[in-house]
């Protein structure tokens, strides 16, 4: 183990690398597929209060400062008024081959279909069909994945010239 990894391990523990964080989440009972990568894992917050309520598929990429929640604490306001704890929770399902952009928030009850891109800073609620690109607050469909692939192909040469200047 190199010096950098040793420092990360001492400072961030199980969040010091993508592999360690994924392994730890699995040990808590979370279902996580193969080839899942957490970029800057120490900045990613994945709710482990009920780990069985979050499912992450294969080939999922979650970037820095993202949060995935399967519950909330809004009941605290109602408890103050009524004395009742009216908790709220919901499954979170992230399909296969999904990219979640930086600083996105995946809320309880969210379901992200296969082959989906979530733009940076998005708030995901409810069901998002697969083979699509979503962004915004709340996340809305921007385009089909096929249209986005064609757009990226068309821009590839133009953007490549920026790299060689």
What are these regions (language model features)?
Residues 1-35, 52, 59, 73-77, ...:
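Terminal amphipathic alpha-helical/low-complexity segments used for targeting or macromolecular assembly
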Residues 117, 133-135:
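Short-chain dehydrogenase/reductase
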Residues 34, 96, 114-115, 130:
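Short acidic capping loops at alpha-helix termini that bridge into adjacent secondary structure
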